Amino acid sequence: MPELPEVETVRLGLQPAMEGARFDTVALRRADLRFPFQPDFTDRLTGQTVTGLSRRAKYLLADLSSGDALLMHLGMSGSFRVIEPGGEATPGDFHHPRSEDRSHDHVVFSMSSGKTVVFNDPRRFGYMKLFRRAAIEDEPFLKGLGPEPLGNAFDASMLARACAGKKTSLKAALLDQRVVAGLGNIYVCEALFRAHLSPKRLAATLATKAGGPTERAEKLVEAIRTVLHEAIQAGGSSLRDHRQTSGELGYFQHSFAVYDRESEPCRTKGCGGVVKRFVQNGRSTFCCPKCQK
């Protein structure tokens, strides 16, 4: 599933095509994705102007001139592509062309900018929903999400408070969207490696007895921010389905230190350890047991 950097990469690609533009036509090529489209979805969206395009956790949010907001989730295999007025996909910054199967083009937005935005989703785990922007605090998909890891509210003190007293593992805590929003398996593994922390370590050890942040918490917050910034700059990680809106692949996967590197040498200078893979809560975890404690 796309994580924060992949969704942010998609947002940056959609922004020039959608922000400030009007939905001239909305074509739904099936009645549902993961969930059925709302009966008035097309009518509410057609003719509205996108006043802002943002991201919350792994969701894209398009604010509309009507006061509605369009929530979009990529699911497991969803992707957007932007087609220029001449019919060509927007050129990308990277090198790998997209393999298109247009039978999975389920939603087509024709924008007043002359560009066409297409949502393609082979597995159909993605979804879209309209809701009133003023009621965002009550929107079920967004309610209860933790702070953004790249936002000002996310710091070592906040993370220590969220983890204080927790008996769960550090990795499980970071994957809990109520603790911090948008992190997934890839970037949690990579951030824990950079902070030299074991994914098996108790989350509670990020807090002192008084509830303040430990040095571990400080290092982890810095590692999370750094990994996410680098991944966004690289266009995200393309392991299976992620594509940018240009149809190009991201390339942060070439910078992985531990994820998907089982039995390969640890990249910490002088460590000499080997990356191990094991299963935590049904997900593969990658780490170097020698330098992650």
From Swiss-Prot:
Catalytic activity field: Hydrolysis of DNA containing ring-opened 7-methylguanine residues, releasing 2,6-diamino-4-hydroxy-5-(N-methyl)formamidopyrimidine; 2'-deoxyribonucleotide-(2'-deoxyribose 5'-phosphate)-2'-deoxyribonucleotide-DNA = a 3'-end 2'-deoxyribonucleotide-(2,3-dehydro-2,3-deoxyribose 5'-phosphate)-DNA + a 5'-end 5'-phospho-2'-deoxyribonucleoside-DNA + H(+)
Named cofactor requirement(s): Zn(2+)
Keyword rRNA processing appears in the UniProt entry: no
Active site (catalytic residues): P2 (schiff-base intermediate with dna), E3 (proton donor), K58 (proton donor), R283 (proton donor)
Entry binding sites for DNA: H104, R123, K166
Entry-linked InterPro entries: DNA_glyclase/AP_lyase_DNA-bd, Formamido-pyr_DNA_Glyclase, FPG_cat, MutM-like_N-ter, Ribosomal_uS13-like_H2TH, Znf_DNA_glyclase/AP_lyase
Superkingdom of source: Bacteria
Note on how the cofactor is bound: Binds 1 zinc ion per subunit.
Family: Belongs to the FPG family.
Function: Involved in base excision repair of DNA damaged by oxidation or by mutagenic agents. Acts as a DNA glycosylase that recognizes and removes damaged bases. Has a preference for oxidized purines, such as 7,8-dihydro-8-oxoguanine (8-oxoG). Has AP (apurinic/apyrimidinic) lyase activity and introduces nicks in the DNA strand. Cleaves the DNA backbone by beta-delta elimination to generate a single-strand break at the site of the removed base with both 3'- and 5'-phosphates.
Subunit structure: Monomer.
Protein name: Formamidopyrimidine-DNA glycosylase
Species name: Rhodopseudomonas palustris (strain BisA53)
Gene: mutM
